Amino acid sequence: SGDSGDGMQLAGNIFSTVSATVGNDISTFPDYPADIRAPQGSLTGVSGFQVHIGANKVFTPGDKCDVLVAMNAAALKTQYKFAKSTACIIIDTDCFQASDLQKAAFKTDNPIEEMGIKQDVIAAPISQMVKDCLAETGMDNKAMLKCRNMFALGLVCWLFNRDLKIAEDFLKEKFAKKPEIAEANIKVIHAGYDYGHNTHASVAHTYKIESKIKTPGVYMDIMGNKATAYGFIAAAEKAGLKLFLGSYPITPATDVLHELSKHKSLGVITVQCEDEISGCATAIGASFAGALAVTTTSGPGTVSYTHLTLPTT
């Protein structure tokens, strides 16, 4: 967990992919802040990604976590309640400065003591170590700090005895058009892994989960938005209609737009609009033209849609 721009969703997705690839069952729950452009370090701007992995069938994302990553003071303040009494907590001490603690409404300069945290805490200067790791890459400070999530991911991969090769392949594919970004992230993820190995960070909380090789072609990694997109395609096919999506990109609804845009060969038409009202308006127009038309929103757009409500007599 961390700020919206800390890349928690990406780190969670990569760890999920790594775990699924080695044969673990997974269930995930991405958690996005309700605020639009919440102030950095604020309590209302915390974003998180929950991953539940196991050797046997996993049915839910789980209630309490064994490992909690808090990239700043606000994340620790809001997410600590989800940590088990035996959990391991990872924090970036560079983001627990006086100003960070003030934003998170801490009253003292020792949040661990103030919250009465008894669990093991891996307190690492993640931000500084990332900058040291990438010092010779020529990247600016802002670009380097965007890799903080990969350091935390590398440390978590060490705790769970995960092979980094799968994570490397994921990053190379995601940043195929920007190989320098892929290499920077790969370098940092190894730095996080090595930090855990060299310092034996929280040896009491290393995990080994039995892996079971899955039969190729039988299983897939799917999230709710992707399943929703497939449902739209199936509904249009059964209705004998073309599928139209008018959408404004806004997290997390953007995933539906991204997925449907891949399936033009199946008669899917997607339009990216400048705002959510436009997205809804194009869908209404497409429905009058005979298409199965849908629009998406992460929530706030629902209010905007009322402006397009047609009066009836």
Residue ranges and their predicted role:
Residues 1-239, 303:
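Active-site cofactor/cluster-binding pocket
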Residues 15, 282-283, 306:
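Aromatic/hydrophobic pocket-lining residues that form π-stacking "cages" and hydrophobic walls in ligand
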Residues 45-47, 272, 285, 308:
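Flexible glycine/proline-rich, aromatic-decorated loop/lid segments
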Residues 95, 250, 312:
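Short, glycine/acidic-enriched loop or turn micro-motifs at the edges of active sites
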Residues 299, 313:
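Conserved AMP-binding A3 loop
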Residues 306-312:
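Conserved small/polar residues in nucleotide/adenosyl-binding loops
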